[in-house]
């Protein structure tokens, strides 16, 4: 005769039975409010069931509280942004902040937020950096500036620069002028920068005139039939012609200084070529 297997109640069975017991008692207590048997029914509930019920209630209350806080914060952001959309306010969470897959990838923005009417175009200065009154002649939106035309239009400024240089030189030579050392040094620096600017403009004008004259000669010879097609200078040929023209336009002292600089440069180049590394023996 086979014996029957004894089935022991597991921990989960006890937990389910205690939960059923707790729910049964609570439902019964709701239906029989004010009866004398409430205390007896509550005394039969185990402490484990009461503890589990308390933790469930705490979790439910905490979840409800966080949902209310998120709703309030999203409602405040909605009214602060001033959007006229009729939709519900968005819930702000950490999921909205998306990280880039690559640092060179373009930045992503939400399509639910309204785009500002004034946008910053890359390559152009922003609206915040610009002043109220701007000069459209130097605006980058109108293309690259023509330096030759600008130089021709503002050539009259050279007279003012020359007059300013003469005033500075006379002020430095005047022994009666009550200038301290700092003021003299500042005037000397301004005078030097102004002279270097004038030299740069003069050299640029010389280069433009030489190249324009050469181009005119080529076009005239082409029209007369002396050449089959006009010859445009290479960079090396252009540099040689400009150096020769600059050397011819220099004064004797300036030529000596230029020759001395060129000689030192050539010597330094030769010394660098003669240098050698000692071999390890």
UniProtKB/Swiss-Prot annotation:
The cross-references to InterPro entries, in alphabetical order and at most eight, read: RRP36 (IPR009292)
Q: Where is this region: Disordered?
A: 1-135, 243-281
**Record key words, sorted:** Coiled coil, Nucleus, Ribonucleoprotein, Ribosome biogenesis, rRNA processing
Give compartment(s).
Nucleus, Nucleolus
Write out the biased-composition intervals (Basic and acidic residues).
65-75, 245-259
Coiled-coil annotation: which residues?
48-78, 161-205
Query: Which residue intervals are annotated with compositional bias (Polar residues) in the record?
Result: 24-36
Q: Which GO terms describe its biological process?
A: maturation of SSU-rRNA from tricistronic rRNA transcript (SSU-rRNA, 5.8S rRNA, LSU-rRNA)
Q: Which domain of life is it from?
A: Eukaryota
Q: Name one GO cellular component term.
A: 90S preribosome
Main localisation: nucleus
What this protein is reported to do is described as:
Component of the 90S pre-ribosome involved in the maturation of rRNAs. Required for early cleavages of the pre-RNAs in the 40S ribosomal subunit maturation pathway.
Q: How does it assemble?
A: Associates with 90S and pre-40S pre-ribosomal particles.
Q: Which family does it belong to?
A: Belongs to the RRP36 family.
What protein does this entry describe?
Answer: rRNA biogenesis protein RRP36
Q: Which organism encodes this protein?
A: Candida albicans (strain WO-1)
Which lineage is the organism of this entry classified under, starting from the top rank? Answer: Eukaryota, Fungi, Dikarya, Ascomycota, Saccharomycotina
């Amino acid at each position: 005769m086979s014996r029957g297997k004894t089935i022991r109640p597991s921990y989960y069975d006890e937990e389910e039975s205690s939960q059923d017991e707790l729910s049964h008692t609570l439902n019964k207590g709701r239906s029989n409010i004010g009866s004398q048997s409430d205390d007896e029914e509550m005394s039969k509930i185990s402490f484990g069931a009461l503890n589990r019920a308390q933790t469930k209630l705490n979790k439910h209350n905490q979840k409800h509280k966080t949902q209310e806080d998120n709703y309030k914060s999203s409602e405040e952001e909605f009214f602060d942004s001033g959007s006229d959309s009729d939709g519900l306010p968005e819930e702000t969470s950490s999921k909205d902040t998306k990280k880039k897959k690559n640092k060179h990838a373009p930045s992503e923005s939400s399509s639910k937020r309204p785009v500002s009417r004034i946008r910053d175009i890359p390559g152009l200065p922003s609206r915040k950096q610009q002043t109220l009154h701007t000069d459209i002649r130097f605006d980058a939106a109108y293309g690259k500036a023509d330096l030759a035309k600008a130089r021709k239009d503002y050539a009259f400024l050279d007279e003012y620069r020359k007059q300013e240089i003469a005033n500075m030189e006379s002020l430095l030579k005047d022994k009666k002028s009550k200038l301290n050392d700092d003021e003299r040094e500042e005037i000397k620096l301004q005078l030097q920068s102004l002279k270097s600017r004038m030299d740069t403009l003069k050299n640029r004008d010389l280069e433009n005139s030489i190249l324009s004259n050469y181009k005119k000669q080529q076009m005239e010879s082409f029209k007369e039939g002396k050449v089959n097609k006009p010859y445009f200078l290479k960079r090396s040929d252009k540099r040689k012609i400009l150096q020769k023209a600059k050397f011819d336009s220099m004064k004797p002292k300036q030529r000596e200084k230029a020759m001395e600089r060129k000689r030192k440069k050539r010597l330094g180049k030769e010394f660098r070529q003669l240098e050698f590394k000692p071999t390890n023996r």
